[in-house]
């Protein structure tokens, strides 16, 4: 299959980086699958699962089922995952069965950290100049699942799964007709994803969402830290403080001032003061729309 992949294809260096990281994770992956080695049912190699999950992200494949369908005929996918032309693809349920195991052992976090370590070893990171940003992530839950918490508690008590007897959410009057109702995260929760929060930002409509946050090293624009939080008005700044604190702790010289760039949504007094206390210079855009900016003018 290697002959079918162009020499300059962008997946080639990515596969090299991923394989180098996976090689260092051999002991971790061995512990994860020790039960299978001792006589349990053989599992799909975790290295192949991880590479397949990366393809799903790179190519925005909506589901594991679609990913496996495409892998069946896509030679590039087979090459990246490590499948030959004759190998059978596995069923999509394999991802569900193994995802908890990957999460339990922080496998993806370890892979990410090892990739960042490679970038550092190649002197691609400054370690001193960063930017932070957040974005909304739509939850896999709809408005119809967002019902009153007391109603959800009643359903849990009587053993109901929250669906109508016909299995159609539209039969539920509250779930199907929510226009004009006052709904908030204090009084309502999603029966599909209890961690999702009803949230809107700017001119966007209110949706059940999470928030994703990234910390980028400015030298080459590489993401060096990332996390997902519940969606609220404080999440961006709280996540930024945690991530830049990690960067601060990782720097060899605590006296060296590092910088953090951010948009005007991060212009809040408590956030700016926290950065300054960490010896982090806040390169934050000033928000002067009907208010006084917390960012000092000299910055």
What kind of region is each of these model predictions?
Residues 291-298:
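Short, charged, surface-exposed secondary-structure boundary motifs
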Residues 72, 81-280, 285-287:
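Polybasic low-complexity intrinsically disordered regions
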Residues 279, 298-299:
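C-terminal structured "cap/appendage" subdomains that terminate the fold
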Residues 4, 12-124, 139:
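Basic, low-complexity intrinsically disordered segments
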Residues 9:
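ER/Golgi luminal nucleotide-sugar-dependent glycosyltransferases, focusing on the catalytic module
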Residues 1-2, 151:
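Short, flexible loop/hinge motifs at secondary-structure junctions
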Residues 33, 289-290:
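Short linear loop/turn motifs
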């Amino acid at each position: 299959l290697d002959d079918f992949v162009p020499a300059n294809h962008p997946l080639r260096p990515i596969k090299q980086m991923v394989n180098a990281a996976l090689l260092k994770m051999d002991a971790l992956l061995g512990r994860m699958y020790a039960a299978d080695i001792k006589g349990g049912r053989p599992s799909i190699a975790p290295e192949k699962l991880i590479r397949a999950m990366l393809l799903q992200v790179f190519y925005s494949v909506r589901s594991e089922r679609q990913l496996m369908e495409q892998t069946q005929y896509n030679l590039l996918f087979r090459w990246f995952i490590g499948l030959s032309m004759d190998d059978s693809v596995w069923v999509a349920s394999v991802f569900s069965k193994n995802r908890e195991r990957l999460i339990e052992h922080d496998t993806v976090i370890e892979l990410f950290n090892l990739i960042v370590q490679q970038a550092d070893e190649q002197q691609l990171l400054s370690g001193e100049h960063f930017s932070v940003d957040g974005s909304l992530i739509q939850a896999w839950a709809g408005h119809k699942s967002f019902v009153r918490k007391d109603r959800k508690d009643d359903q849990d008590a009587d053993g109901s799964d929250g669906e109508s007897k016909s299995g159609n959410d539209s039969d539920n009057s509250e779930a199907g007709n929510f226009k004009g109702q006052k709904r908030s995260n204090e009084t309502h929760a999603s029966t599909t994803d209890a961690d999702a929060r009803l949230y809107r930002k700017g001119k966007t409509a209110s949706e059940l969402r999470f928030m994703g946050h990234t910390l980028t090293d400015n030298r080459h624009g590489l993401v060096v830290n990332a996390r997902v939080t519940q969606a609220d008005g404080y999440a961006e700044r709280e996540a930024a403080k945690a991530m830049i604190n990690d960067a601060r702790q990782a720097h060899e010289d605590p006296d060296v001032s590092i910088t953090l760039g951010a948009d005007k949504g991060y212009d809040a007094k408590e956030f700016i003061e926290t950065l300054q206390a960490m010896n982090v210079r806040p390169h934050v855009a000033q928000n002067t729309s009907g208010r006084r900016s917390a960012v000092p003018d000299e910055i």
